[in-house]
Swiss-Prot record:
Keyword Cytoplasm part of the UniProt annotation: yes
Organism: Haemophilus influenzae (strain PittGG)
NCBIfam families assigned: PRK05474.1, xylose_isom_A
Catalytic activity: alpha-D-xylose = alpha-D-xylulofuranose
Subunit comment: Homotetramer.
Example GO biological process: D-xylose metabolic process
Binding note for cofactor: Binds 2 magnesium ions per subunit.
SUPFAM superfamilies: Xylose isomerase-like
Protein name: Xylose isomerase
Cofactor(s) recorded in Swiss-Prot or TrEMBL: Mg(2+)
Keywords: Carbohydrate metabolism, Cytoplasm, Isomerase, Magnesium, Metal-binding, Xylose metabolism
Catalytic machinery residues: H101, D104
EC number: 5.3.1.5
Domain of life: Bacteria
């Protein structure tokens, strides 16, 4: 097989003093931190769609990226070539996982029969490549938003035949994920929302997507899939109002349909930005609600109101993200998937390596800094002191339901309670965090 990235053999760890652009400065896969290797902590994955499918097009211009496999008039042969190049890239980068949508890996064809045949054909190839390389599938999913049939939604579509088509794709993608040993299955409602209530039955659409998710859970148990089901929140884009706005909204949806024990969340940094939240907030919320599953690692631009899907480059932001994950015990089946794309001016094929190497080093350094914060209890001691009153008899009685509004009102009057404000010490804590990050 001809090498596409023939200038390099394998990306390796060379340390902080290295000036080699094709080397890791901080990511040492075998370095042990808090009892696990970096590789075990981060569980890195490359996404198929942005990395191997996007041609650099945007709303204002045609594709700018030269991708030889996209020029093949035989679309299935092009998909085979794409699989070869994808696994060459994955192997040389040295990441353990990848992720895909069904139509990322295989052409959809002109009928449902062609869709199924093409998809199964490429899954056969991916299965062989996984055996050959040891690279595994972090998660699979179905693209139920690109085809025009989904312009009014998939599970939320006013036409039940479109609902059935989406079910067909998810059925096949879940089965393929199971076959390939995928550790999760993701559901992103790309067009599960609406543009205007003038033509929308909101209650009905919520019931439709609720039933769809119940069917997904039923199928998971029917086929014996041991992985985790994940919903990926996003507030808007492509629709104006998305039903899976943020982590808290998703949790309310799961509770409504009795799915809170069955489905967790896959959190994307850029989606948190669009929702008006910090990345750290979304992860902390998911951990507090016990629905934290996996991460789509990228970044957005606070000045832009759309999904820019840039590679993560902030150690400051990701140290706090990593801190929340470590506090929660780390990933189980999830990991860091780079749902990020190079800029459309980055037309050199090796820009893909620069982007991933830099992002991986950012996560590795963030992991080291977060581990130090956790070990030294940089923040936790102060947080524990701040809430110490809730460990008192009064605090425990309130939490255990042994008090009422009336008994508390009587207590305050009897003891003439006059609690004094205590400093939140935000500036001091920010200084402590910076000391760790820049040490």
């Amino acid at each position: 097989m001809t090498s596409y990235f023939d200038k390099i053999e394998k990306i390796s760890f060379e340390g902080e003093k290295s000036t080699n652009p094709f080397a890791f400065k901080h990511y040492d896969a075998n370095q042990v931190i808090l009892g696990k290797t970096m590789a075990e902590h981060l569980r890195l994955a490359v996404c198929y769609w942005h990395t191997f499918c996007w041609n650099g097009n945007d709303m204002f211009g045609l594709g700018s990226l030269e991708r030889s496999w996209q020029k093949n008039p035989n679309l299935l042969a092009g998909a085979e070539q794409k699989a070869d190049i994808a696994f060459e890239f994955l192997n040389k980068l040295g990441v353990p996982y990848y992720c895909f949508h069904d139509v990322d890996i295989a052409p959809e064809g002109n009928s449902v029969r062609e869709y199924v045949q093409n998809f199964h054909h490429i899954v056969d190839i991916l299965e062989r490549k996984q055996v050959e390389t040891g690279i595994q599938l972090l998660w699979g999913t179905a693209n139920c938003f690109t085809n025009p049939r989904y312009m009014s939604g998939a599970a939320t579509n006013p036409n039940p035949e479109v609902f059935a088509w989406a079910a067909t794709q998810v059925f096949n993608a879940m089965n393929a994920t199971q076959r390939l040993g995928g550790e999760n299955y993701v559901l992103w409602g790309g067009r599960e929302g609406y543009e205007t209530l003038l033509n929308t039955d909101l209650k009905r659409e919520r019931e439709q997507i609720g039933r769809f998710m119940q069917m997904v859970v039923e199928h998971k148990h029917k086929i014996g899939f041991k992985g985790t089901l994940l919903i990926e929140p996003k507030p808007q884009e492509p629709t104006k109002h998305q039903y899976d706005y943020d982590v808290a909204t998703v949790y309310g949806f799961l509770k409504q349909f009795g799915l809170e024990k069955e489905i967790k969340v896959n959190i994307e940094a850029n989606h948190a930005t669009l929702a008006g939240h910090t990345f750290q907030h979304e992860i902390a919320t998911a951990c507090a609600l016990d629905i934290f599953g996996s991460i789509d690692a990228n970044r957005g631009d606070p000045q832009l109101g759309w999904d820019t899907d840039q590679f993560p480059n902030s150690v400051e932001e990701n140290t706090l993200v990593m801190y929340e994950i470590l506090k929660h015990g780390g990933f189980t089946t999830g990991g860091f998937n780079f749902d990020a794309k190079i800029r459309r001016q980055s037309i050199d094929p090796y820009d893909l390596f620069y982007a991933h190497i830099g992002a991986i080093d950012v996560l590795a350094l963030s992991l080291k800094r977060a581990a130090k914060m956790l070990q030294e209890e940089t923040l936790q001691k102060i947080v524990n002191e701040r809430y110490a009153g809730w460990n008192s008899e009064l605090g425990q009685h309130i939490l255990q339901g042994k008090t009422s509004l009336e008994t508390l009102a009587q207590l305050v009057q009897q003891k003439d309670l006059a609690p004094k404000p205590v400093s939140g010490q935000q500036e001091y804590l920010e200084n402590l965090v910076n000391q760790v990050i820049y040490s």
